[in-house]
Amino acid sequence: MRPVSQIERTVAPFEVVSPYQPSGDQPTAIAELARRVQAGEKDVVLLGATGTGKSATTAWMIEKLQRPTLVMAPNKTLAAQLANEFRELLPNNAVEYFVSYYDYYQPEAYVPQSDTYIEKDSSINEEVERLRHSATNSLLTRRDVIVVASVSCIYGLGTPQEYVDRMVPLRVGEEHDRDELLRRFVDIQYTRNDMAFARGTFRVRGDTIEIFPVYEELAVRIEMFGDEIEALSTLHPVTGEIISEDQQLYVFPASHYVAGPERLERAVNDIEKELAERLTELEKQGKLLEAQRLRMRTTYDIEMLRQIGSCSGVENYSMHFDGRSPGSPPNTLLDYFPDDFLLVIDESHVTVPQIGAMYEGDASRKRTLVDHGFRLPSALDNRPLKWEEFQERIGQTVYLSATPGAYELSRSDGAVEQIIRPTGLVDPEVVVKPTEGQIDDLVHEIRRRTEKDERVLVTTLTKKMAEDLTDYFVELGIQVRYLHSDVDTLRRVELLRELRAGEYDVLVGINLLREGLDLPEVSLVAILDADKEGFLRSGTSLIQTIGRAARNVSGQVHMYADKITPAMEKAIDETNRRREKQVAFNKANGVDPQPLRKKINDIVAQIAREDVDTEQLLGSGYRQTKEGKGAKAPVPALGGQKTGGAKAARGRAKETAVTDRPAAELAEQIEDLTTRMRAAAADLQFEIAARLRDEVSEMKKELRQMREAGLA
């Protein structure tokens, strides 16, 4: 149910800012996609070959259509990459990022066979939580919004109407009782803290109130004269520098699950009623242990709700807080969008099945908890949308993939093709070779490539084979590395950077050489056991793997097989079809394929040096903190789209004295940003990591100046 709001959304045009113009197949694809959507087609498919610029095409399409857009990606890392690309292409519009805010999540579960109860355990990433709030804030206040999300967007997200109703509007000249205003901030889950000013808190100094919204990087200052708001301003939370003077601002709740006293009391009464009914049912079935367990757990939760307004696992009572009937769908991010929003599903061959699978996986775990007295039946209604419910809530959809699935193709009136690359690069030549003598042949091909300073990817079916092959190559003196699931994320980044930099020549892997790897130096992809049918050698998997050689002018794919399977035939035919079309286009237009030159980010080494320097500057306390913190979820930007980030804010305001920032607070910020810098690099977010590195360097310089001046 979409919320009814008095807020008038600001209207600014979507505008792509890029030094490049659409080229290759892009102009035709953009025009055709826009035409089909404007003609009212509900489902449109863009079949875009690897490296043809599908993200840029999507941005130009949004510019033509001028509609709020939700872009769904299959995982957090791809969502972060997309958000970065859209932010670069549409710098003047709100590009938001909405994924699960858990760095670590162990769901509550019960295993009847061993009578094992597993408690819920999780770690929340505060920056990702801020970005989630920023997304809903943008959707409610403006129309030029693109939200890049994972399947997290189909999970329950409080009650949008309650979220809007409890928002606090502030306008210069309006009258507000000061104490009543403070009570309203507390009601929407902001905490008063006059000592440590952090996100989600407010502080009071005489007639001045400062509040730090959970979705912003900048704080808000409210200056009052009696009961009248005299001035509103946006300021930097650390330095106190005024960034802008405002006439009107909105403060949204600090939680999407905000509930007023009346709603809370009604929910508690409903929970008590459901508990009584369920206990009677269990006792009739002779399940006395389950009844006792449920009584103890639920009465404790009810008492916690009455005393502090929340409890552990409060999301399991969301049906009662939302006032929904059993079985009805939850409110999700989709309900925050205006009615005419556009949905874009990236890598649709992966994402569409993922959306459909979410509900059953969640429900089977919760049914066990309900059956054994750990949860009330209403816990089953704290769930993601079912596929049918998801379809009811979306309007027009554009599916993007190099290998669209049967579902997308069956719903559209033929796919819009984007086969020609702006660089003129063509799909690699596919060569099928017999398995007899395959390793000797592969060694010969590797030697040919290394002589030309090119790189090779080798994909095997099993971990054992990959290990044995790597050992054999080492014996032959080939510079080789092995990429597998046991390699941690940061080391994986280093391996890919080292391959591109030429520190070694061959990378052996299993299923890690498909979507998301951008390696222009790779001229040969070798697929061993290509004729062994299964998930890793399906038509879709083979096309995706072939795409890894599509960024090199002399790219080739060698499939080692004794027979041509239907999957191989499909992949080879599709690759040849695209290749013929690309070669014909280049010939007709006099295009000379240009090698893709991408800067090799040596950010990993820089981060390691920055880490050592930070440790020397901050001492042993930093080392302990560093060891205690895990890698965070990928985040697409250091600062909010609307504010330009903390660094930009400082750049816009006048310089302040070094003494304006306490040394302890500065050291804490250096520590926090260094952790985020490492996390960004671990998720291949090199631009963010570089920006964070610059920020850390600036702060360390400031701290050293303070120490030299005897101020720290």
Curated annotation (Swiss-Prot):
Motif Beta-hairpin in this chain: 101-124
A Gene Ontology cellular-component term: cytoplasm
Gene3D superfamilies in UniProt: P-loop containing nucleotide triphosphate hydrolases (3.40.50.300), UVR domain (4.10.860.10)
Span of domain UVR: 667-702
Compartments it resides in: Cytoplasm
MF annotations from Gene Ontology: ATP binding; ATP hydrolysis activity; DNA binding; excinuclease ABC activity
InterPro entries attached to this UniProt entry: Helicase/UvrB_N (IPR006935), Helicase_ATP-bd (IPR014001), Helicase_C-like (IPR001650), P-loop_NTPase (IPR027417), UVR_dom (IPR001943), UVR_dom_sf (IPR036876), UvrB (IPR004807), UvrB_inter (IPR041471)
One Pfam family matching this protein: Helicase_C
Gene Ontology annotations of biological process type: nucleotide-excision repair, DNA damage recognition; SOS response
Sequence segments annotated as region (Disordered): 625-655
SMART domains: DEXDc, HELICc
Binding annotation for ATP: G48, A49, T50, G51, T52, G53, K54, S55
General function of this protein: The UvrABC repair system catalyzes the recognition and processing of DNA lesions. A damage recognition complex composed of 2 UvrA and 2 UvrB subunits scans DNA for abnormalities. Upon binding of the UvrA(2)B(2) complex to a putative damaged site, the DNA wraps around one UvrB monomer. DNA wrap is dependent on ATP binding by UvrB and probably causes local melting of the DNA helix, facilitating insertion of UvrB beta-hairpin between the DNA strands. Then UvrB probes one DNA strand for the presence of a lesion.
Domain topic, free-text comment: The beta-hairpin motif is involved in DNA binding.
Subunit structure: Forms a heterotetramer with UvrA during the search for lesions. Interacts with UvrC in an incision complex.
UniProt-recorded name of the protein: UvrABC system protein B
Protein species of origin: Streptomyces coelicolor (strain ATCC BAA-471 / A3(2) / M145)
Name of the encoding gene: uvrB
